[in-house]
Amino acid sequence: MEKKKIVILGAGESGAGAAVLAKAKGYDVFVSDSGAIKDKYKTIFSENKIAYEEKQHTMEKILQADEVIKSPGIPSKAPVMKKIYEKKIPVSGEIEFASRYTKSKMIGITGTNGKTTTTLLTHHILTKAGLKAGLAGNVGHSLAMMVAQDPRDYYVLELSSFQLDDMKTFKADIAILLNITPDHLDRYPSFENYIDSKFSITRNQTSADAFIYCEDDLVIAENLSQHNISAQPYPFSIKKKTIPGAYLDNNEIIINLKNHQNPTFTMSIHNLSLQGRHNIYNSMAAAVAANILNIRKEVIRDCLSDFRNAEHRLEHFATVHGVDYVNDSKATNVNSTWYALESYHRPVILILGGVDKGNDYSILKDLVCEKVKAIVCLGKDNKKIHKAFKDCVKMIVDVSSADEAVATASGLATKGDVILLSPACASFDLFENYEDRGRQFKRAVKAL
């Protein structure tokens, strides 16, 4: 019998993992990438005798596929995808494909902001509790690679809307939806499409599964009834009492999974390692998931108080001459920057700008007027930023490198100020990615 042909588009982390798993399951595998393939992935393909091509898509080969697994970074509108859809070849993503070959518990985490933090925190709790848990999706390793070579009992998955779009049969045992605010509107015809994409994390869930979501998020609250959700709901809120679920009472996180008088779990927000209102939400979501899995309360408390977040997320990394430097380069949209500003009660010099994804800066206006004494624009086109804030910020300066941004901001700062890199924009105009932007910022500060 002829082997089923699988073509994998995109040879990054997820593509390489999908290729290795497909090969292990007996498929005829071909990997195609329109760009250059990194040496580490070429080595993986060679070791596993997987055919590949780079810097091109040979359509003749691609269109022979029985199934195509595409990288989440490839838009459905891409020319290569249009031809695949015309031939009615089934298309799925790496997570969807990998989930067919494992019966392990899946914890899926999505939302516009806070995904990585909540995913890392949830994984930290599971690991410390002694569970064999893998970290995959948008963070950590490829799920397919782990399923093929290093299987775990639990997988904690950070899921972007693009990854969710490529799923049909995937089911989360525990689904977490943190928030929904306008983002990636360059990839979606409308905000409604983006909302539907985020809610699709609940697809295929049954009453035996859990859906943890933020009750305070207006978009989630307004759209909840329009989605047919079968899972057990566990809302979390800092504004009202939610049972079953999590809520705040006198600065105590209270989790009550059953409708009993006695709470399942309590902890003071002052003991959380992650500070700021948005991080109370992230901590609540992870703690509810951990309680559903019956992890011991002491372990959850320890993890919520000793967790160290990933780089580039409100990362306070230096104090020079009484000025605090904070790297929040991961803030690639306006809402992330709103959360960052909301966390500070001292004068802020804000480094803002980059590739604008259709930002509405009016959301930031009140906080900027209240807290920001100067704005340093780090991007090629800053007209929108000047227009949005010229009325309430006297000093707005344009710069074109991280070194220049740090030198300018330092010159404007006085003791007790915070210099905050929280750009509200993507980074591709001046930097490789947000990590590169954050590291260049930190290097420039260290050179002061």
List PLM regions with ranges.
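N-terminal leader/targeting and accessory segments in enzymes
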Residues: M1-G93, F97, Q275, K387
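Phosphate-binding loop of NTP-binding sites
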Residues: K4, K23-A24, M59-L63, P72-E215, ...
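Residues in the short beta-alpha loop(s) of Rossmann-like NAD(P)-binding domains
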Residues: G12, G35, V139, D216-D217, ...
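C-terminal helical cap/extension that packs against the catalytic core
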Residues: K42-T43, S362-D417
